[in-house]
């Protein structure tokens, strides 16, 4: 059982931070490649030790080779992997993930995403195994708590499903087969052009959504007739924001609230996973946000996972940086037990007993069809499915997931309705008090009793109906 790989990366100070007359210091003092001393805005000092610390002079290649390369290699061999960039807005997350751009970018500035794509296809082409590889690409963003397909904008509210054999799935998401890195990067560019961005006082091109790049790598072995499937997910999180620093208002402020809420949900999941001894009875609130639901497999342990905590080195942002580092330290305690997803190929899975059973069912249905109407046949097939005589494990798992989603949404809707009613009751009570005070001033005691009786009867009738 291994822990999550957690690294910190300090970007160079911005021109604004360099010009600031009140504070011109940096908040991190290096000790070695894994440890540094952090000084907060109150000048209190904390020592942090992580798997690796990338200081201001670090290169994109160094981050890739330590953080992403091992996970990418395992994904090609059937072990799921997840790489996440986390930090406040303007801390360098998108630069670390993409670089200045994922196409036509010099080698020095290439981000994790283009390096992973190139490395993945290089490993596939140099593989000594006699196998056929299939790579599929999907790309989604979580914007205002809706999952949008960035490769097909008509799919603006992708549903998240759970399958007992395949884990978390995005129902109906576009999956594009890609044969080489050039083709993959072209599709990624198309998706990135559709991502929601906006301008704030801290970032001229601030991501207004969480973005996930999903690669499914299937390896069909010719020799032993086995199929390995690895999922590789790269997640560029939107940054946590403080409205007084970003100057956000209107739509941008609402986006920031939603972003902060989902990041808070992520923190709650990590707290639940790392607080105290684990047991089957522990509730992990994966369903509190779309982000945590999509990351459920990674956070739950069936994936290698790496977290890059992107930080500002300036004392101007010391409180936000401290929060980011503490988040990383908590995530470091998540336990992971990733396992290779390997099954026999469809032909190898066929067994005489199952074939015989299917043939018998088929012959019975054919005989019955000879003497029954189409309507009767349809009804009988429905009964067979309902009674479990003929059924699909995948469809049954999907039904369970849909049921759970409906229950969760119903509870949320009811809670919202109760909250709204409570607000109305408070408003009516306030109005009642005002009327009572006015009546007392006007010496009209009868009106006080009438309004009190009206409020009481309305309140009672609602909760008894």
Curated annotation (Swiss-Prot):
Compositionally skewed regions (Basic and acidic residues) per UniProt: 341-358
Protein name listed in UniProt: Kinesin-like protein KIN-1
Keyword annotations from UniProtKB, A to Z: ATP-binding, Coiled coil, Microtubule, Motor protein, Nucleotide-binding
UniProt similarity note: Belongs to the TRAFAC class myosin-kinesin ATPase superfamily. Kinesin family. KIN-1 subfamily.
SUBUNIT field: Homodimer. Interacts with WIP1 and WIP2.
Gene3D superfamilies: Kinesin motor domain
Function noted in UniProt: Kinesin-like motor protein that promotes synapsis and is required for proper crossover distribution in meiosis. Plays a role in the nuclear division cycles during megagametogenesis.
Renumbered residue ranges of the record's region Disordered: 338-358
Residues involved in ATP binding: 87-94
CC per GO annotation: microtubule
Summary of the tissues where the protein is detected: Specifically expressed in ovules and anthers.
Domain Kinesin motor: 3-334
Record-level Gene Ontology MF annotations: ATP binding; microtubule binding; microtubule motor activity; protein homodimerization activity
Gene from which the chain derives: KIN1
PANTHER family: CENTROMERE PROTEIN E, KINESIN-LIKE PROTEIN
Originating species: Arabidopsis thaliana
């Amino acid at each position: 059982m291994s822990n999550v790989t957690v690294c910190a990366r300090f970007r160079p100070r911005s021109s604004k931070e360099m010009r600031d007359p009140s504070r011109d210091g940096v908040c991190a003092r290096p000790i070695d490649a894994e440890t540094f001393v952090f000084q907060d805005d109150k000048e209190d000092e904390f020592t942090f030790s992580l798997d690796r610390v990338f200081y201001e002079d670090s290169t994109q290649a160094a981050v890739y080779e330590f953080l992403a390369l091992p996970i990418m290699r395992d994904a090609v061999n059937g072990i799921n992997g997840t790489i996440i960039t986390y930090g406040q807005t303007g801390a360098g997350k998108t630069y670390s993930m993409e670089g200045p751009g994922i196409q036509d970018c010099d080698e020095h500035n290439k981000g994790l995403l283009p390096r992973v794509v190139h490395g993945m296809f290089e490993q596939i082409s140099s593989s000594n195994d006699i196998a056929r590889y299939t790579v599929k690409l999907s790309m989604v963003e979580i914007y205002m708590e809706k999952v949008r397909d960035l490769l097909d904008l008509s799919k603006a509210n992708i549903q998240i499903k759970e399958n007992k054999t395949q884990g978390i799935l995005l129902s109906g998401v576009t999956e594009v087969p890609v044969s080489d890195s050039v083709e993959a990067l072209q599709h990624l560019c198309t998706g990135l052009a559709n991502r929601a961005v906006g301008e704030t006082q801290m970032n001229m091109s601030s991501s207004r959504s969480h973005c996930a790049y999903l690669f499914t790598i299937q390896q069909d072995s010719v020799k032993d007739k086995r199929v390995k499937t690895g999922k590789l997910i790269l997640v560029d999180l939107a940054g946590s924001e403080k409205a007084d620093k970003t100057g956000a208002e209107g739509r941008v402020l609402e986006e920031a609230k939603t972003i902060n809420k989902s990041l808070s949900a992520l923190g709650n999941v990590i707290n639940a996973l790392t607080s105290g001894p684990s047991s089957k009875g522990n509730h992990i609130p994966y369903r509190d946000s779309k982000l945590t639901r999509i990351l459920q497999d990674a956070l739950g342990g069936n994936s290698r996972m790496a977290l890059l905590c992107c930080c500002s080195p300036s004392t101007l942002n010391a409180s936000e940086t401290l929060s980011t580092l503490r988040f990383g330290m908590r995530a470091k305690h998540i336990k992971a037990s990733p396992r290779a997803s390997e099954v026999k190929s469809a032909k190898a899975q066929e067994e005489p007993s199952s074939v015989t059973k299917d043939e018998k069912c088929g012959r019975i249905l054919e005989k019955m069809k000879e003497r029954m109407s189409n309507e009767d046949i349809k009804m009988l097939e429905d009964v067979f499915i309902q009674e479990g005589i003929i059924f699909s494990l995948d469809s049954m798992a999907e039904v369970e997931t849909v049921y759970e989603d409906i229950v969760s949404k119903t509870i949320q809707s009811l809670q919202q309705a109760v909250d709204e009613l409570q607000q109305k009751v408070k408003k009516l009570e306030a109005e009642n008090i005002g009327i009572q005070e006015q009546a007392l001033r006007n010496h009209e005691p009868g009106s006080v009793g009438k309004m009190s009786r009206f409020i009481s009867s309305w309140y009672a009738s609602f909760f008894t109906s």
